[in-house]
């Protein structure tokens, strides 16, 4: 497989650079930068030793005995700190943080994250190929290394939902020709791959032909299905469901991306890995989705490593997974190791438990110090991303299910995340279905202008009692306008607030908007600062806590954003109706029988 690379601004194979580095390593020329007084974590052996490090341009020229050299243009005092390679986030979506790539880079670099593998499928689902091109251009000049992947499942479940675009194998192949694209992003249409669907087979084969990564999303796959998924050419997974699932997929040979957004499973994962007595070379780390308040308060991949250590993983294991193992997966021998001849991506941490970064170096340049950015970050014009929510105002009647008769039997979607089909009987009043006691409503309206925008309505059980409504255009993965609630009036109110804002999140209760976060860029992100976005998102959380009673780990706020992910097994509400990828069934209306 080819090395996975963006178009690096500094070529390590430049003969002049190598000649300068060799001369400096011999002692015949000074270093550009010399880091002294620190201790070095060897990501391969896990050992910590005292060492000084000499840099020439973007290259590590020397790792040598402490105080044995003093000749350098700039000397950095690392006393008391521990030096590691820059952290590598193996799977993430910038859009989940609801800020621009430039703002995201400014957030994670001060935490020691120097490389991320970004699947821009949220932009792809809304803006199509132009959205992916915008993401590539936005990432190109940032001091954060962003390796983009070609979104493989746009939409996630063809025929069951309608997104803003449709990426077939020809579109994927076009993206893969870009040096900025490192492979095929998480293949979520598992059933299509396993069943040999021509569309999905062609997409995976495009990735294989490119020699680049083919990444997976193998939630719930076992036995013959897992073997078939891997036999098609998929080589990784971040959708682990238990410690037993982790053990099985490690044994199967998948590269594992331990996912920080599944915090309730991390301790179980640590116990499994500790039981092995060693860290497999195929274990890496990822954030996947980090909300803006979490990013602002805690950071990115450093927080995943920090929690793993808190749950009992050896710090050197967590950092190896986040550096050397990740670089090996990417076939990037220049990354993931502090050694002569490698790329100068370095982090100086205060210690190996709290992992607070004192200094961050990327390509031999100081980009952040003591939690603040020092490198310039140039944002890209966001004008191409506006006006993506193409819906007229909605009314209360749009959030009711019409029916004639006295009573009705309806289909329901039971419980968050691991959904199941259910049924309920209820009455019909004034020509509309009365929501069954204890249920909530979910409505999805197509917002991309490719079909009518009348919401399709479903009924949720196991979601608790709703005392208001929540509307979002962040709704994986087609990102149609999605509304939850127990009252049609509040649902219409929240929906219209979001439509007026051009996309975003809104909470309504008792006929009034309680909180709103406008996301006018693709209905996914804002060009506001992370600080302001985090504050507004926190207000949304607080408002949501007042209208619904959560029950972790599955009935949680985050579940609202994945309730329409139709590629996952079981029934999910989409803009087409209640869809089940396992059977291919779509119910345009939840009404099954009228009495």
Curated annotation (Swiss-Prot):
Its EC number is 3.5.4.2. The keyword Amino-acid biosynthesis does not apply. GO terms for biological process: adenine catabolic process. Its cofactor is Mn(2+). It catalyses: adenine + H2O + H(+) = hypoxanthine + NH4(+). It is an enzyme of class 3 (hydrolase). Pfam families: Adenine_deam_C, Amidohydro_1. Keywords: Hydrolase, Manganese. Belongs to the metallo-dependent hydrolases superfamily. Adenine deaminase family. One of its GO terms (molecular function) is adenine deaminase activity. Disulfide bonds: none annotated. The keyword Zinc does not apply. This is Adenine deaminase 2.
């Amino acid at each position: 497989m080819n090395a996975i690379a963006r178009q690096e601004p500094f070529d390590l194979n430049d003969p002049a650079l190598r000649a300068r580095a060799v001369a400096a390593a011999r002692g015949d020329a000074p270093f550009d930068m010399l880091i002294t007084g620190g201790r070095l974590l060897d990501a391969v052996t896990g050992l910590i030793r005292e060492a000084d490090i000499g840099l020439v341009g973007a290259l590590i020229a020397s790792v040598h005995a402490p105080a044995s050299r003093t000749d350098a243009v700039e000397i950095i005092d690392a006393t008391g700190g521990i030096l590691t390679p820059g952290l590598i986030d193996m799977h993430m979506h910038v859009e989940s943080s609801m800020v621009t790539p430039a703002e995201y880079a400014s957030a994670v670099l001060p935490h020691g994250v120097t490389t991320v593998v970004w699947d821009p499928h949220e932009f792809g689902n809304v803006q199509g190929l132009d959205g992916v091109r915008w993401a590539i251009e936005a990432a190109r000049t940032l001091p954060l290394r962003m390796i983009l992947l070609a979104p493989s499942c746009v939409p996630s479940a063809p025929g069951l939902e309608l997104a803003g675009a449709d990426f077939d194998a020809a579109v994927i192949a076009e993206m893969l020709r870009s040096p900025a694209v490192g492979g095929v992003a998480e293949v979520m249409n598992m059933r299509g791959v396993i069943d040999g669907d021509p569309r999905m087979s062609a997409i995976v084969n495009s990735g294989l032909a490119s020699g680049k990564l083919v990444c997976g999303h193998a939630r719930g796959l076992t036995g013959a299905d897992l073997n078939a998924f891997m036999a098609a050419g998929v080589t990784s997974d971040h959708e682990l469901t238990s410690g037993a699932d982790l053990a099985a997929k490690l044994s199967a040979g998948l590269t594992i991306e331990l996912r920080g957004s599944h915090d309730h499973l991390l301790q179980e994962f640590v116990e499994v890995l500790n039981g092995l007595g060693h860290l497999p070379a195929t274990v890496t780390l990822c954030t996947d989705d980090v909300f803006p308040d979490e990013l602002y308060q805690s950071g990115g991949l450093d927080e995943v490593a920090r929690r793993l250590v808190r749950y009992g993983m050896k710090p050197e294991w967590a950092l190896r997974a986040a550096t050397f193992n990740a670089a090996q997966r990417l076939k990037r021998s220049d990354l993931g190791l502090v050694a002569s001849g490698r790329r100068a991506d370095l982090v100086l941490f205060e210690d190996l438990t709290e992992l607070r970064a004192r200094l961050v170096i990327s390509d031999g340049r100081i980009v952040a110090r003591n939690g603040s950015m020092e490198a310039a970050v140039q944002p890209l014009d966001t004008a191409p991303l506006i006006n993506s929510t193409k819906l007229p105002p909605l009314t209360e009647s749009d959030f009711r299910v019409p029916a004639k008769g006295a009573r009705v039997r309806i289909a329901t979607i039971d419980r968050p995340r691991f959904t199941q089909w259910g049924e309920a009987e209820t009455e019909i009043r004034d020509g509309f279905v009365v929501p069954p006691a204890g249920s909530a409503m979910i409505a999805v309206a197509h917002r991309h202008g490719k079909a009518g925008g009348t919401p399709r309505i479903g009924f949720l059980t196991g979601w608790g009692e709703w005392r208001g409504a929540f509307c979002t255009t962040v709704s994986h993965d087609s990102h149609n306008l999605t509304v939850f609630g127990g009252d049609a009036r509040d649902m219409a109110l929240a929906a219209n607030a979001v439509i007026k804002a051009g996309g975003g999140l809104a909470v309504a209760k008792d006929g009034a908007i309680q909180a709103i976060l406008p996301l006018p860029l693709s209905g996914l992100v804002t060009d506001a600062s992370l600080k302001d976005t985090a504050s507004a998102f926190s207000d949304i959380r607080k408002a949501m806590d007042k209208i619904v009673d959560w029950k972790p780990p599955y009935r949680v706020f985050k579940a609202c954003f994945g309730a329409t992910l139709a590629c996952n097994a079981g029934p999910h509400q989409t803009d087409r109706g209640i869809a089940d990828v396992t059977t291919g069934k779509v119910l345009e209306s939840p009404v099954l029988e009228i009495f």
